[in-house]
Amino acid sequence: MSDPQSPRAPRWALWLPLGLFLAFVVLVTLGLLKPASHDIPSRMIGQPLPAFDLPAASDARPGLATRDFATGKPRLLNIFASWCIPCAVESPVLAQLARQGVEIDGIAIRDHKPDLAQFLARNGNPYARIGADNVSAVQLAIGSSGVPESFVIDGKGTIRYQHIGDIRPEQVPMILAKLQEAGQ
């Protein structure tokens, strides 16, 4: 009587599932370790500002409208709020830009006049105009997804650049370059 031997699977066939599983685990781990970008760039870059006319958010400055950007000079539009910690951190940098001749307009998001007045008194007021966007309608229309965000607007009212997050001191030269590009 012969002992029928069952056919053996090749040795690699035993290790293949384990190898594939380990490769999967490594790829998933690397994907989880990579920081996710939560930045949502505006689709409005290269487009004219949407029409808006915001009331004054502060007694110290006039409101803000689309027509204010058709001056022939590039401007920085800063989306901020008194309740935003990074906005307070950004304030000295905006003041530095204003001292260097940059015209800065602000849109205060979901803010209250007394809170905003206190914020500006504490952190300085680099803004030529501040519009009150109490329901974030203009913020969303220009493609902003959070605060702070800044946009370089050319002298015709076209959005040329979006900066997501607070502007840091080391980014000032880049912002100045973007403003200069927008003025050409």
Where do the protein language model's features map onto the residues?
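N-terminal targeting signals for export/organelle localization
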Residues: 1-55, 184
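A short beta-strand-turn-helix
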Residues: 52-76
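Hydrophobic alpha-helical transmembrane segments of integral membrane proteins
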Residues: 10-14, 88-89, 144
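Hydrophobic beta-strand anchors of alpha/beta hydrolase catalytic cores
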Residues: 76-77, 104, 150
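Aromatic-flanked redox-active Cys/Sec active sites in thiol-based oxidoreductases
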Residues: 78-83
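Thiol/disulfide oxidoreductase modules built on the thioredoxin-like
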Residues: 121-126, 133-184
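Structural microenvironment flanking redox-active thiols in thiol-disulfide oxidoreductases
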Residues: 88-124, 134-140
